[in-house]
Amino acid sequence: RGAAALQAIPHCVLLKGQGAKGAYISGLCTSPEHRRQNIGNSLMAQAHFHLYTLGTTFATLIPAEPWLHDWYGKCGYTKDIKCLPAPKGFATSSFEDYDRWQRSHDCILLNDADQFDIACKDYGLDPDHYLSQQEPVQGMIRIINAKKALELYASENTGMEMTVLVTGDRHIPANNCYYTIAHGNVTTSHEPRPDAQVMTIQQLSTFIFGSQQPVMCLMLN
């Protein structure tokens, strides 16, 4: 029997009309006899590094319990995303109608047609689960690839010129370096820059999204 497990479901993140690879992480669990052995953190680190090798830019999740917000925070996640209630009547609408709705948001974790179909079937099994959610639920998001995330930011802020030093990402050490933003482009370096603004991977997430909070919907948890 396995000691721990999780699943990372591929999604596309839409940010101001630009698409980026994303993943929704769910089902993280550790068998009772293997708890308090740092196995969960190790599994998350492996998952994050694997997602990085796949070219993923962001990972998202919804903590099952309030106390898990702090635990996921130590894994690099921030509370910079919310899960919206399901659109009224979504289960009887077409995917095309739902797709127009989801793409009306500036920053959202997109569902494809298959994922929408799964959510509709899940609704048929337990409609109360969807109808009971009236307010947005706090989710969490993590930057998997700092350079790709900053490239999205730079393309929307072509007048921005600055250097960022990302530090302390233990799950994805490749993110820890200097990033220079200029004229809509991003370059990396390991040469010290005294003018660099130092950020953790969590602070970088808040910097990139700012007041524009990403959203997601119809996530199975």
Cite the ranges covered by each PLM segment.
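Conserved acetyl-CoA-binding loop-helix of GNAT-fold acetyltransferases
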Residues: 27-30, 36-49, 74, 128
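Conserved GNAT acetyl-CoA-binding A-motif
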Residues: 44, 51-64, 131
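Active-site cofactor/substrate anionic-group-binding motifs, chiefly glycine-
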Residues: 11-17
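Core nucleotidyl-transferase/polymerase catalytic module
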Residues: 1-3, 26, 65-67, 73, ...
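Amide-forming acyltransferase catalytic core, primarily the GNAT-like/NAT-type
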Residues: 76-162
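C-terminal functional modules
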Residues: 134-221
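Conserved beta-strand in the GNAT
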Residues: 2-11, 22-29, 60, 130
